Swiss-Prot record:
Subcellular location(s) of the protein: Cytoplasm
GO biological process terms held by the UniProt record: rRNA base methylation
EC number from the UniProt entry: 2.1.1.199
SUPFAM superfamilies with a match to the protein in the record: Putative methyltransferase TM0872, insert domain, S-adenosyl-L-methionine-dependent methyltransferases
Family per record: Belongs to the methyltransferase superfamily. RsmH family.
Swiss-Prot/TrEMBL catalytic activity: cytidine(1402) in 16S rRNA + S-adenosyl-L-methionine = N(4)-methylcytidine(1402) in 16S rRNA + S-adenosyl-L-homocysteine + H(+)
Keywords per UniProt: Cytoplasm, Methyltransferase, rRNA processing, S-adenosyl-L-methionine, Transferase
PANTHER family: 12S RRNA N4-METHYLCYTIDINE METHYLTRANSFERASE, S-ADENOSYL-METHYLTRANSFERASE MRAW
Protein name listed in UniProt: Ribosomal RNA small subunit methyltransferase H
UniProt binding sites for S-adenosyl-L-methionine: 35-37, 55, 84, 105, 112
Top-level taxon of origin: Bacteria
Length: 316
């Protein structure tokens, strides 16, 4: 595997083991990334089993073709270069009507963060980009330089939950009147100018939340996850499972809400039984999110904010 695609998979065994993999089953890795989850899942399949792996980043697919070569030779893997929000349409096109399990590792992957030219990191000077799909048209540059004040405030509050959203949006407006804001370093410095001294002393980079907000906007991450997870629940076979790893509160709240809605039912009191069409489709496999072990936290700094939630299909 090439150095630039080194990626330490978070919650590797927990995510796949909780899928209760059937050796002859059909499975999906919705977020191929460094292919760690895919590789471990494939190790649990027989040659009759099959994995469909999604990624909109061609570099990730190229890397995975090397890492998963032994399984590809056996015809056990199909790569799909597309946004996972098109999960159902892509799988139907591949002739798949039902799946036995699917895993999601939401957010940006380590290789994307580590590749300076992708413009995801506030720690490395690069053009403002942040596209997970390099063929997409909307970039971080467009958001920062063309969104009006009110739209900037909206995404900074909604996706970054930054209490200085208004001040940062105003400072961006002022800066871009002089010249376009072109690089990650320029943007990070503008954000630093707004934050008071006591905020700058806090743990974590002062630009982290704003960069997260712009990245989510550029890639419509929450909208895509919402659509995809709902499609996955529809496509699951009975007893099939979904594992979702999240890395920030917005992703986790979305996942928790989707799973809660699918696993609970509101019916009038006094009904002698629940009609089939009102029965919940899903069941929570774990009431609380599964967190990384102490060993993983020590070995991989990026696992600190990870949470894993799992549901099982109990009713069609």
């Amino acid at each position: 595997m090439t150095k630039e695609f080194h990626h330490v998979t978070v919650l590797l065994h927990e995510t796949i083991d909780m899928l209760d993999v059937k050796p002859d089953g059909i499975y999906v890795d919705a977020t191929l990334g460094g292919a760690g989850h895919s590789e471990y899942l494939l190790s649990k399949l027989s040659e009759k089993g099959h994995l469909y792996a999604f990624d909109q980043d061609q570099n990730a697919i190229d890397n995975a073709q090397k890492r998963l070569a032994p399984y590809i030779e056996k015809g056990m893997v199909t790569f799909i270069k597309d946004n996972f929000r098109h999960l159902q349409a892509c799988l139907r096109e591949a002739g798949v009507q039902e799946i036995d399990g699917i895993c999601y590792d939401l957010g940006v992957s380590s290789p994307q963060l580590d590749q300076r030219e992708r413009g995801f990191s506030y720690k490395k000077d690069a053009p403002l980009d942040m596209r997970m799909n390099q063929d997409a048209s909307l970039t971080a540059y467009e958001v920062v330089n063309n969104y009006d004040y009110h739209d900037l405030v909206r995404i900074f509050f909604k996706y970054g939950e930054d209490k200085f959203s208004k001040q940062i949006a105003r400072k961006i407006e002022q800066a871009r009147e002089v010249k376009p804001i072109e690089t990650t370093t320029e943007l990070a410095e503008i954000i630093k100018l707004v934050k008071p001294a006591k905020e700058l002393k806090k743990k974590g980079h002062p630009a982290k939340q704003i960069f997260q907000a712009i990245r989510i906007e550029v890639n419509d991450e929450l909208g895509a996850a919402d659509e995809s997870i709902q499609q996955a629940m529809d496509m699951l076979a009975l007893d099939g499972r979904i594992s979702v790893i999240t890395f920030h509160s917005l992703e986790d709240r979305l996942t928790k809400q989707l799973f809660k809605e699918a696993s609970t039912v509101e019916v009038p009191k006094g009904l002698p039984f629940i009609p089939d069409d009102l029965k919940p489709k899903m069941e929570l496999v774990s009431r609380k999110p599964i967190l990384p072990s102490a060993e993983e936290l020590e070995a991989n700094n990026r696992s600190h904010s990870a949470k894993l939630r799992v549901v099982r299909k109990i009713h069609k």
